[in-house]
């Protein structure tokens, strides 16, 4: 920037800066038709006070069709009021005038890139955090003091002191406030107004916190709107929320929020927010984008019905953008709920797996309680699916002392248990849900595992966590039938080489040693073992959650439900159906030959056609 622009900046008032940015968003981020629709929507619902048109909290909630049962209206309105003041945090909360609301829509739909060149996702998340946070030096200071107390034991007592917010303890770059305001700086820079930033337009995220209750309500809404399209109303997505559905949303929201370590803290600090979102919930806020795209479609407006009220603004003559016609009977988000997977857990999965591979794209392949808990049934139902799959397993922690011979046999095949469970003793009756995203077709393992670097291991309950594949080892997924070691289904445990397997087989009992971060289901599909060693070094990275920093655990659990879902459209399902039909025809042919049809002449002809006997009833040639 030149000298002249620096002199011009101080003459711009905050109102002028806000107006200038809104005008640039309008001219560069939207088409004329989209702007017309936005203006129509705003004017049709705006209240007026002292000549100023604005939207109130009830108006925003009514337009977005936010369910009253979630109580999230005030949280979302607070966020919008903050974003409406962008890029001047000192002016927040802003009155939601037409210009302020346009800035809100621009930021939440991520359309600001044509004006603000720095488009990093982290910068966008930082603005969302600020919109949700409250600034209380007393609360944040008490948390920082606790961080400092926890930082020292974390370094020396890895197992028990990993709980807490050690990652929020002061680190290099803690005081780099300019870095915290890059998006604000970029917006001001686009208007040659960086001088305003130097005069006090800063909002240090390290002196703030998102209240737990507010965050919980927002996560409930995000679970509900995760599958929404820009042309789909929230009322059509969830026409009525039953008490059971609200309770389910709340339960899963608690699981997700627990990943932020809020049990012993009043809220979520920025460092924890940024770390957890980046590591385990990268798509958490994606649903806000299509929700706020609703402002760009004028619904139920007919230009033939013009207002003649002289006090109303003159009506433009631009045509309205009609929302695309909705399909009367759209394909369901999930063909049918499983014993583990339902709509709410599907939304939870979409927070770290792309939604376009999940919603309306899943097919139930295998259910242990329906098809039988056996490796053969699993193979028959899953192996013909030539696309990615999602494996889900649910169970409860086994008691420390075996209560029957089956549990004793499991204990005998494992080394003595040194690691604690992931849940405290008082909560050991809680349901565990682990799972995996397998990007490749299933197969028998043989000498090497299958899967690739996009394989994901995860936990959905009682805490949300994601363990991404590493490049250190490629022992991603295996499917082994005895005597191949280790027998069963699993991820993250190395397959013994042929020589070592032979050496091990000479022992009367072969101990199974799980990988550092691994999931193993025994070959009876009766028990599961999830192991987490924070030092890592295996096929999957250890947990990146601050609350689990340097924490080791091993869950040995009895399997209650096991499911596999196929990711893919109708074409993949049709290919699988044809494969199953072919296999069924082959099996039927073999049964008719082996068991007989009851007609001796027909049996003889079938055997002759198969080359098993010759015309004189002697055995067929094998040459």
From Swiss-Prot:
Protein name in UniProt: Restriction of telomere capping protein 5
Gene name linked to the record: RTC5
Keyword Cell membrane: no
PROSITE patterns to which the protein is assigned, alphabetical: TLDC (PS51886)
Ranges annotated as biased composition (Acidic residues): 169-179
Major localization listed first in the record, in broad terms: cytoplasm
InterPro entries hit by this protein: TLDc_dom
A Gene Ontology BP annotation from the UniProt entry: response to oxidative stress
Pfam families the record matches: TLD
Subcellular locations according to the entry: Cytoplasm
Swiss-Prot/TrEMBL keywords: Cytoplasm
């Amino acid at each position: 920037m030149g000298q002249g622009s620096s002199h011009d900046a101080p003459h711009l008032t905050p109102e002028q800066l806000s107006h200038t940015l809104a005008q640039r968003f309008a001219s560069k981020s939207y088409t004329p038709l989209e702007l017309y629709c936005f203006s129509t929507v705003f004017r049709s619902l705006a209240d007026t006070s002292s000549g100023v048109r604005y939207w109130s909290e009830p108006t925003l909630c009514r337009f977005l069709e936010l369910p009253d049962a979630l109580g999230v209206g005030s949280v979302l309105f607070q966020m919008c009021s903050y974003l409406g003041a962008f890029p001047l945090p000192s002016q927040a909360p802003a009155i939601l005038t037409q210009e302020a609301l346009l800035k809100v829509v621009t930021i939440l739909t991520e359309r600001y890139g044509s004006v603000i060149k720095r488009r990093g996702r982290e910068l966008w998340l930082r603005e969302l955090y600020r919109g949700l946070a409250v600034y209380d030096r007393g609360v944040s200071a008490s948390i920082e003091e606790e961080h400092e107390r926890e930082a020292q034991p974390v370094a020396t007592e890895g197992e028990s002191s990993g709980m807490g917010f050690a990652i929020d303890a002061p680190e290099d770059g803690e005081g780099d406030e300019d870095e915290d305001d890059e998006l604000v700086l970029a917006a001001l820079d686009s208007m040659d107004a960086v001088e305003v930033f130097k005069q006090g337009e800063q909002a240090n995220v390290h002196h703030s916190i998102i209240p737990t209750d507010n965050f919980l309500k927002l996560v409930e809404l995000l679970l509900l709107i995760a599958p929404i399209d820009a042309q789909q109303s929230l009322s059509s997505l969830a026409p009525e929320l039953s008490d059971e559905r609200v309770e389910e949303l709340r339960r899963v929201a608690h699981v997700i929020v627990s990943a932020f370590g809020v049990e012993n803290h009043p809220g979520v600090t920025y460092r924890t927010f940024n770390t957890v979102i980046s590591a385990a919930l990268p798509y958490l806020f994606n649903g806000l984008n299509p929700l706020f795209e609703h402002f760009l479609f004028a619904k139920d407006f007919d230009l033939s019905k013009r207002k003649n009220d002289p006090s109303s603004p003159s009506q433009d003559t631009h045509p309205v953008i009609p929302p695309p016609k909705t399909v009367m009977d759209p394909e369901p988000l999930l063909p049918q709920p499983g014993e583990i997977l339902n709509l709410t857990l599907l939304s939870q999965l979409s927070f770290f797996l792309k939604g376009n591979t999940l919603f309306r794209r899943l097919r139930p392949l295998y259910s242990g309680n329906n098809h039988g808990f056996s490796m053969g049934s699993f193979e028959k139902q899953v192996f013909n699916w030539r696309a990615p799959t999602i494996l889900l397993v649910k169970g409860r922690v086994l008691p420390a002392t075996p209560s029957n011979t089956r549990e004793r046999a499991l204990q005998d095949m494992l080394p003595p248990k040194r690691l604690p469970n992931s849940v405290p003793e008082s909560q050991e009756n809680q349901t565990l849900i682990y799972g995996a995203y397998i990007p490749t077709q299933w197969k028998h393992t043989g000498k090497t595992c299958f899967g690739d670097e996009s394989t994901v291991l995860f936990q959905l309950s009682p805490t949300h966590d994601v363990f991404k594949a590493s490049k250190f080892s490629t022992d991603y997924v295996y499917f082994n039938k005895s005597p191949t070691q280790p027998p069963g289904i699993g991820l993250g445990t190395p397959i013994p080489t042929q020589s070592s397997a032979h050496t091990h087989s000479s022992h009367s009992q072969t101990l199974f040693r799980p990988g550092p971060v691994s999931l193993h289901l025994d070959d009876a599909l009766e028990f599961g073992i999830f192991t987490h060693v924070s030092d890592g070094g295996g096929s999957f990275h250890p947990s990146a959650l601050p609350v689990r920093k340097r924490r080791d655990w091993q869950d040995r659990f009895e399997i209650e439900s096991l499911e596999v879902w196929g990711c893919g459209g109708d074409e993949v399902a049709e290919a699988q159906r044809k494969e199953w039909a072919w296999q069924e025809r082959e099996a039927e042919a073999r049964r008719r030959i082996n068991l007989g049809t009851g007609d001796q002449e027909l049996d003889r002809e079938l055997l002759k056609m198969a080359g098993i006997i010759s015309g004189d009833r002697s055995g067929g040639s094998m040459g």
